[in-house]
Amino acid sequence: MTDFGSFEAQAQALAQPLSQTEKAAAVLLAMGKSIAGKLLKFFTQSELQAIIAAAQSLRAVPPHELEALVNEFEDLFTEGAGLMDNAKAMESILEEGLTPDEVDGLLGRRATFQSYEASIWDRLMDCDPVIIAQLLAREHPQTIAYVLSMMPSSFGAKVLLQLSDKQRPEILNRAVNIKNVNPKAAAIIEARVIEIIEEMEADRNSPGPAKIAEVMNELEKPQVDTLLASLETISTDSVKKVRPKIFLFDDILFMPQRSRVQLFNDVSTDVITMALRGSAAELRESILASIGARQRRMIESDLAAGDAGINPRDIAIARRSITQEAIRLSASGQLELKEKEPEAA
């Protein structure tokens, strides 16, 4: 039997006049994608979005009405009038005339690769290569080779350099000859890598160690040493989290020479002079050896005049500005705060 209720609803829908946007959608659909696609560039972004919305809810358009619509548009002709799947047809037209990114934007979608979460190997790049190398050094060479082969090359190179000279040849050989890895073994390794990343991200995002390090960086070395020793009696783990974030003026002595040169390259003569007042002879010499001869003579001349009338607070501020710059440059990978420890024999 005929569904008269449905028939009546369709009749009422056909009686409703089309809006200008609906007319445009109907004509574009009737043209076919090759012709309609060429016309899309003449519409603005907002107009295209309105036409897409209209096409998705467009009622059935009978041939005689469609003919009348087409007559409203000069120089246009129909290329088939199948309007059964308006949404799909409009998508096809968009793909004909626009780039994939533009189509995705108009349809409110994004390509899978764009929305897909960054892989665990890309996330590793936010970690400290020194710590990653220390963790990997405990693993089997084949595991290390697999992890290095999966890392972004720039980060993998940094990690490789942190591994011992004794380990590198075997790891490189295994990485060169690595073949299909057992999926189960790969899944186990990747699960562990995810755990490491999450642990490191949690530590990095924790405000506690960073805040305590900031406080200690304002103190003198004897005070910091005393506080760390006291903290170590309570929690060795807490000391391990805080100590790497602490960098005092006296620690400049333990920087690699090339890093010292880079650090003081952009520090003004006045700041260096103020920071060196009252400093130990060995530290002073290490800093003066990192600057140009002319600048060194000027600083030595000022220091020879003595420290009379110098405010200790100004000395502390100058030293703090230098250590802050060192921490900043280290965080960006431009220098090293400490010499690498010699490898065990």
Curated annotation (Swiss-Prot):
InterPro entries: Flg_Motor_Flig, Flg_Motor_Flig_C, FliG_a-hlx, FliG_M, FliG_N. Its main location: membrane. GO terms for biological process: bacterial-type flagellum-dependent cell motility; chemotaxis. The keyword Membrane applies. One of its GO terms (cellular component) is plasma membrane. Coiled coil: none annotated. PANTHER family: FLAGELLAR MOTOR SWITCH PROTEIN FLIG. NCBIfam families: PRK05686.2-1. This is Flagellar motor switch protein FliG. The gene is fliG.
